[in-house]
Amino acid sequence: MASIAVCPGSFDPVTFGHLDIIRRGAKVFDKVYVCVLNNSSKKPLFTVEERCGLLREVTQDIPNVQVESFQGLLIDYAKSKQANVILRGLRAVSDFEYEMQGTSMNKVLDENIETFFMMTNNQYSFLSSSIVKEVAKYKGSVAELVPEAVEAALEKKFAKNERP
């Protein structure tokens, strides 16, 4: 049986921390679906389509990664892809507490889908999309935090005086 993972997130925008988890996950699993979720509790800077486009651009060199979007329950998306794993990145203990709730709910919805936690590399342990947007908003350099395509997209967004 092929190992198929779903790596969900809002990716607003995708950072080197996200890419670290995606790349490492692609070495562990036969197929990784990167699923851009529309989180109704967040006001995104980039549209779902823009986020998918950026993710496709920065993962095009990883043959077993496919980027898609989904609205609804993550567990339903995972089942539709015949995934047996949900791949999640952790930066700190606070991430674990949040992720534990989601994992427990997913187990109630489908006990056959496992959650696989992967710690980010230390150099990305502080990194979040929110931090990236805040730095970019005030014209700080995000070159060490995001791929070039994302940096350019952020510059374009904030040149229009759009706010995160």
From Swiss-Prot:
It is found in: Cytoplasm. Keywords: ATP-binding, Coenzyme A biosynthesis, Cytoplasm, Magnesium, Nucleotide-binding, Nucleotidyltransferase, Transferase. ATP binds at S10, F11, H18, G89, L90, R91, E99, Y124, S125, F126, L127, S128, S129, S130. GO terms for cellular component: cytoplasm. The record marks H18 as: Transition state stabilizer. It is an enzyme of class 2 (transferase). It catalyses: (R)-4'-phosphopantetheine + ATP + H(+) = 3'-dephospho-CoA + diphosphate. One of its GO terms (molecular function) is pantetheine-phosphate adenylyltransferase activity. Pathway: Cofactor biosynthesis; coenzyme A biosynthesis; CoA from (R)-pantothenate: step 4/5. It holds the Pfam family CTP_transf_like. The keyword NADP does not apply. Its EC number is 2.7.7.3. One of its GO terms (biological process) is coenzyme A biosynthetic process. Its cofactor is Mg(2+). The keyword Cytoplasm applies. Coiled coil: none annotated. Homohexamer. Reversibly transfers an adenylyl group from ATP to 4'-phosphopantetheine, yielding dephospho-CoA (dPCoA) and pyrophosphate. This is Phosphopantetheine adenylyltransferase. The gene is coaD.
